[in-house]
Design a protein with these regions (language model features):
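Acidic/polar, solvent-exposed loop/turn segments
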Residues: 1-213
Length: 214
């Protein structure tokens, strides 16, 4: 009689801005799946995101040749009938992850021996990495005989700067006049005890919190 295949759950991991590819019997989803009759006859016939609808996987396909793609929460999985797969993490979907934080994408694949089938999960752990902050140019104005001071998130230089991980963690670390040398801005400072640099028409004092006076 035909014995049912035994499908074993698989796991993998990737950073939020990376791609993983697994091929061959040592790495793909069929590596640890077995069939008492003939394990070499096993193929992947269907794939879906956990909770979603099944998509057929074409016979004879590989991850990079006629493979079937399924979009998860944090990336896209493409899998072949031979069990090979690639997972491309979606940077925009995972941007909210702080460095070191993890989330999972779970996919359910169907294994067939040609007669009967079993299902197993492929769980991809997506790990957040530190994202580069986005700094936006700022402008201000002052009369030639006056002083301006800007403090708080509505006025200082960090107001419109962002970080996908945590904008609240942003701080000013250095300041320099155009064409001049860079000066370090000490951690925890404000404009009142910050770093001063002299420009062509005045002196700017800025703190790590983004507040400044000119």
């Amino acid at each position: 009689i035909n014995d049912d295949p035994v499908a074993v759950n698989d796991t993998d991991a990737v950073n939020e801005d990376a791609t993983i590819t697994k091929t061959g019997s040592e790495d793909d989803v069929l590596n640890d799946d077995t069939d008492a009759d003939d394990s070499s006859s096993l193929t992947v016939t269907q794939i879906k995101k956990d909770g979603g609808s099944n998509s057929a996987v074409s016979s004879g396909s590989t991850y990079n040749s006629s493979g079937t793609s399924v979009t998860g929460t944090y990336g896209t999985l493409t899998i072949g009938a031979d069990g090979s797969y690639t997972y491309v993490a979606d940077q925009s979907a995972a941007d909210d992850l702080d460095a070191g934080d993890t989330e999972t994408d779970v996919f359910v694949y169907t294994v067939s021996d040609g007669t009967t089938t079993q299902t197993a999960n492929l769980t991809i752990t997506v790990t957040g990495v530190n994202d580069t902050p986005t700094a936006v140019d700022d402008t201000d104005a002052v009369n030639e005989d006056a002083t301006i001071t800007k403090t708080g998130s509505q006025d200082d230089v960090l107001n419109d700067d962002t970080d996908a991980d945590d904008s609240a963690s942003l701080n000013v670390s250095a300041i320099q006049p155009s064409g001049g040398s860079s000066s370090t801005v000490s951690s925890g400072t404000t404009y009142s005890n910050g770093t001063s640099v002299t420009g062509t028409y005045g002196t700017l004092t800025i703190g790590a919190d983004g507040s400044y006076t000119y």
